[in-house]
UniProtKB/Swiss-Prot annotation:
Binding sites annotated in the UniProt record for Mg(2+) 2: 181, 185
Gene that encodes the chain: SPS3
Organism: Arabidopsis thaliana
EC number(s) from the headed UniProt entry: 2.5.1.85
Lineage, top ranks: Eukaryota, Viridiplantae, Streptophyta, Embryophyta, Tracheophyta
Keywords from the UniProt entry: Chloroplast, Isoprene biosynthesis, Magnesium, Metal-binding, Mitochondrion, Plastid, Transferase, Transit peptide
Protein name in UniProt: Solanesyl diphosphate synthase 3, chloroplastic/mitochondrial
Length: 422
């Protein structure tokens, strides 16, 4: 597989170079930096929650001239056309059935509230579950030494069920966060249908979210792996932190690209990255492989949200399932506007007045149209997609065709994230 091998040769440089993960100082003179979450030291925890700080260019000594051209190669050099979702379709069906079983409750209204959102908000493509199921295969499951004496087939099957459990837990956490977000944002719709807080009220929406989190906690405990519990607990904490950052930001923070990227990691990428790492941990993989799984999820999540922020300006209400321009109308400043402000500083004053005078939205759009804001945000998303693909290319080589196919599918997802229109 030409593309994956070429990515592996390039990306192995940043895996061997510990400073890429372990220090922001070594890259301080370049427009790329990595900062750790609070509570983790750079030297002893190189993979627990790094946040891209200002990833405008990857032309650092670590990467040489490796820029977003790699992404373009990914779509042309993959050996065969793959549909990542069809590869795991059967398991996605099992996962959906299991989720329906898990949200049953003694109080019928609580169960129906959770079921309402799963039917309308989760079923579709099941993006996060697809990533995690593909990652489980891509990591080429190796049986932990403690279980060597048992039947390999049985252990592998049980391990797959446990890994699928990570996908189920991740979906419940994700949906719970959406239920709570809709209350905080006073949202009317979600993916084109009435949001639960509108249909059943804020109280029931909050309780349904809490209920899903409690079921996720129970499922996590059943895995009996404290490292996995810590990873998913961190992701939940980050969801809360990111939302808090959005609603409590100062004026300067609101217009800071660093702040925006950190908030984006917390709100979107942390759950994907920590879940990917949890899948690796359950397989008994090495720390280096766990880092690669984490980095894939982190960068794919960042790319996904950057494109989402672009689509808020370029998409339509029908295709996005939400009102177009919803971010700027609610005072949420995203990458396209931040980049546009670098060219037109006067845009900041216009955006400041949007909530007082909605007519300023049109003025802001005029500035955005004259700027390279959309283009630069897309380039930044492409760079993160490239890093995600590079992480997969750095996984240990294998002759297993299923593993190769899953890795190609994960790379294909980086392409789909960038080219999606909804």
């Amino acid at each position: 597989m030409l593309f994956t091998r070429s990515v592996a040769r390039i990306s192995s440089k940043f895996l061997r170079n510990r400073s890429f993960y372990g220090s922001s100082q070594s890259l301080a003179s370049h427009r790329f930096a990595i900062i750790p979450d609070q509570g983790h030291s750079c030297s002893d925890s190189p993979h627990k929650g790094y946040v891209c700080r200002t990833t405008y260019s990857l032309k650092s000594p670590v990467f040489g001239g490796f820029s977003h051209q790699l992404y373009h190669q990914s779509s042309s050099l993959v050996e065969e056309e793959l549909d990542p979702f069809s590869l795991v379709a059967d398991e996605l069906s099992l996962l959906s059935n299991k989720l329906r079983e898990m949200v049953l409750a003694e109080v019928p209204k609580l169960a129906s509230a959770a079921e309402y959102f799963f039917k309308r908000g989760v079923q579709g493509k099941q993006f996060r579950s697809t990533i995690l199921l593909l990652m489980a295969t891509a990591l080429n499951v190796r049986v932990p030494e403690a279980l060597i004496g048992e039947s390999t087939d049985i252990v592998t099957s049980e391990l797959r069920v446990r890994q699928r459990g990570i996908a189920e837990i991740t979906e419940m956490i994700h949906v719970a966060s959406l239920l709570h977000d809709d209350v905080l944002d006073d949202a009317d719709t979600r993916r084109g249908v009435g949001s639960l807080n509108v249909v059943m009220g804020n109280k029931m929406s909050v309780l349904a979210g809490d209920f899903l989190l409690s079921r996720a906690c129970g499922a996590l405990a059943a895995l009996k792996n404290t490292e996995v519990v810590a990873l998913l607990a961190t992701a939940v904490e980050h969801l809360v932190t990111g939302e808090t950052m959005e609603i409590t930001s100062s004026t300067e923070q609101r217009y800071s690209m660093d702040y925006y990227m950190q908030k984006t990691y917390y709100k979107t990428a942390s759950l994907i990255s920590n879940s990917c790492k949890a899948v690796a941990v359950l397989t008994g993989q090495t720390a280096e492989v766990a880092v690669l799984a984490f980095e894939y999820g982190r960068n794919l999540g960042l790319a996904f949200q950057l494109i989402d922020d672009i689509l808020d300006f370029t998409g339509t209400s029908a295709s996005l399932g939400k009102g177009s321009l919803s971010d700027i109308r609610h005072g949420v400043i995203t990458a396209p506007i931040l980049f546009a402000m670098e060219e037109f500083p006067q845009l900041r004053e216009v955006v400041d007045q949007v909530e007082k005078d909605p007519r300023n939205v049109d003025i802001a759009l005029e500035y955005l149209g004259k700027s390279k804001g959309i283009q630069r945000a897309r380039e930044l998303a492409m760079e993160h997609a490239n890093l995600a693909a590079a992480a997969i290319g750095s996984l240990p080589e294998t002759d297993n065709e299923d593993v190769k196919r899953s890795r190609r599918a994960l790379i294909d997802l980086t392409h789909r994230v960038i080219t999606r229109n909804k």
